[in-house]
Amino acid sequence: MCNDYKFKTNMASHGQNSLQTGHYLSEGKHIFAPMLKYIQNEDHYREVISRVSKVNESLWIGTADIKDLYVGKEPFLGVLAGLLERGVDVRLIHAKEPGPVFREEFDRYPVLISRLERVLCPRVHFKMMVFDYRTVYLGSANLTGAGIGMKSSTRRNFEAGILTDEFELVDAACNQFDAVWNGSHCKGCGRREFCGAPLR
């Protein structure tokens, strides 16, 4: 749950109107509005993945598919390992076991084995990232190089999503993630035969 959510705004200069900063001027009054960005194609790498290393408290990731990808020259798994070493709570829900290259890369970071929290659910098809309970990405991009990573613009997938700190959207995303994480749907699930470790 996102009970720790705190509305964050970027104090812009007087007279600057921007939904992206969460601050604008109307009739002499400062009005705070949520940030809402449309994210497409390579924006996923610039606007979403770039935020991962900057979280302070928690990072929740939901994805159907997961493969090895890079953030600049560093493996994404290395970035997650760095977060865990800083004490950040990292949770990952994915739908299927990743391939051998990912598993080999995963094993290079002992902290991932000991501290990364993971849930495998074959019904998960949502793609989301929740940053510090304050900002959320919701969209089509899986956690792969072609989806959200840095694959070239001529080879990557066409993806779309939103990045927002609007409270109701962040809270709804947290609640959906939390329900899957806690196994709320496990008991009556019609696909238990495909699940290696039901939570309930």
Regions flagged by a language model, labelled:
Residues 24-42, 63-67:
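Acidic/glycine-enriched edge-of-secondary-structure segments
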Residues 119-123, 129, 155:
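Short solvent-exposed loop/turn micro-motifs enriched in small/polar/acidic residues
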